[in-house]
Amino acid sequence: MNRDRLHLWQDRLARNDSQYENWYTLMDERERLYQGSRYIFPLVNKYRKNNAQTPHVRNICSELIEAQVDSNIPAPKVTAINEKDEELAKIIEDMLRNELDRLPFAEINDLMERIVPIQGGGAYLVEWDNTARTHTTIGELNVVPIHPRQLVPQDGVYSGIEDMDYIILKLPQTREFIYRRYGKDVSFENEAEPDVKGGDGGTAEDMVTQYIAYYRNDAGGIGMYSWVGDVELEDLEDYQARRLRRCAACGELEPTADDGDGEQHALEEEEDTEEPADGVAGRPGLPPDDEDWSGAMRWIDGELWPEEDDKDEEPEDHEARRCPYCGSTEWVYSEEEYEEIWTPITTSLGHRIPGAQEEMYLTGELDELTGLPVPAVRLVPTRVPYYKPLRYPVVLQKNVSVYGQFLGDSDIDKITDQQNTTNRLEKKIIDKLVSSGSFVTLPADASVGVDENDMRVYRPETPADANMIGVFNLEGDVSQDREYLDHVYEEARQIIGITDSFQGRRDSTATSGTAKEFAAAQTAGRLESKRVMRDAAYAALFELMFKFKLAYADEPRAVRTLDERGNAEYKTFDRFDFLKQDASGEWYWNDAFLFTCDTSAPLAANREAMWQ
């Protein structure tokens, strides 16, 4: 473990965390207001107690936030820049629609629809999960919603995540998860920041706080550093690079079980299961995820051994895999820039990638007759560069953009005063009503009990005593309070831009269908900025999902779509369909596509269009 690297990132975390400390406090207050805080802010601290509370809360913060919730997930729209790529654009679009159905986007969207207007923004974390497997595929996309409380952006950079040198995430994890994934024992570490997991903020015995820093490396790629407390978990200079095992002696790649070389396979140890193709493990940048590898652990004869364990500690009866070229049993991991293709590949769209080709070379031996070097022929594979997304795996969604601010504008901040005034008036109205009541007047010498019995007898001595008997009802006048309460509520709605028509309530001001349509259109204009920012975030998310799929989905993936008549149609997303060759013979990956959101939503999903 590199202590200097650990201290460097711990210092960066502490420095940037302190700059956003006031924002974190404000985030907690916003959550309390949304959940219905009874606290009343004092008008003048000198004359009013700071711990005043209302016995009754009309939660206008929650009401106006819930009125804006849209359960419809934006649909992807992919446009090809080149005409010949139209079919590929349609496959990408259908693939993204399938991913929206496979992933729990209904729950993710439901959560983000509340986080974003409450806090002013939220984020999505895109990862490649190699533990998700089927019989024919290895790895799947994974998208996780990130609360702003879990983000530590680089201080002073407000233009966007891609402009930052680094960004740090705080993720609550269990100790067992850390051990399974990284092979590191963190049982002695405590939960450093329990607030990031939400709830009451209490410390859980089995939880720890994992910090993940994504940074821009010197080559322009993405690096990653992760730690828990004082334990380093990962340090990957090129987080999105492929890592394969090579022989420490001769430098040749470790062969897989399906290479087709009988002599080579005879030198390998017998495996119970077939070894899958090279791929990234756990997340992009980790070693190949075969049956011998799981996160930062290795399976050796059915037992899990940490990566950092010394080779001498392996079971005595375990026969190490032997290099078929030099016989060495020592292997090291290396970052690979190119993929070697030995067998020709033909994709579902008919694209053909050539395999190994014959190449003539000089052996170094001299011909006895001519004295010239002896030529020989060898097979040389087609070398294709591995694709890298070169993007931070974090996508930010803002509520409304604000200059000089990392997150957008919060709706809760705009109506905090109105919520406080509402709490104050509710308390005042209740105090008046509770203080009201009935009073009975009797002569001074009267002895009439007050109980539930009727027809009690009282004999006044004089007519004057009889005239003194009476009942007075004292009622507090709350008409002005209620009138102002309605005014404050309407004020809050106007600040956010919510109308009765948008909420589906009876609107007495709209006396015709045209008036209804105009009222809904006004609301749509007020909230248009939020929808634009939402669509922009989803468009960036769709692009990142495609790039991760292009980089790490080694096997062709089935894609279901519908044709013009609504019948099911099945296609294939194959990353090699995006592999192109320029005029000079160099191979490159075609990712030149435009990503937006499809605004042609059905009428039932468009509340503004329902009035048209």
Q: Where are the predicted features?
A:
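Extended, helix-rich architectural segments
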Residues: 1-327, 331-346, 354-356, 366-370, ...
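Secondary-structure capping and boundary motifs in well-ordered enzyme cores
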Residues: 53, 84, 88, 477-484, ...
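Short coil/turn segments at secondary-structure boundaries
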Residues: 77-80, 107-115, 125-130, 432-446, ...
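Short, well-ordered alpha-helical packing segments
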Residues: 93-100, 109, 113, 121-125, ...
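Extended amphipathic alpha-helical segments with heptad-repeat/coiled-coil character used for oligomerization
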Residues: 130, 514-612
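Short linear proline/tyrosine/threonine-rich motifs used for host-factor recruitment
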Residues: 224, 304-306, 373-377, 568-572, ...
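Structured mid-domain segments that build the active-site/substrate or prosthetic-cofactor binding neighborhood
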Residues: 372, 376-521
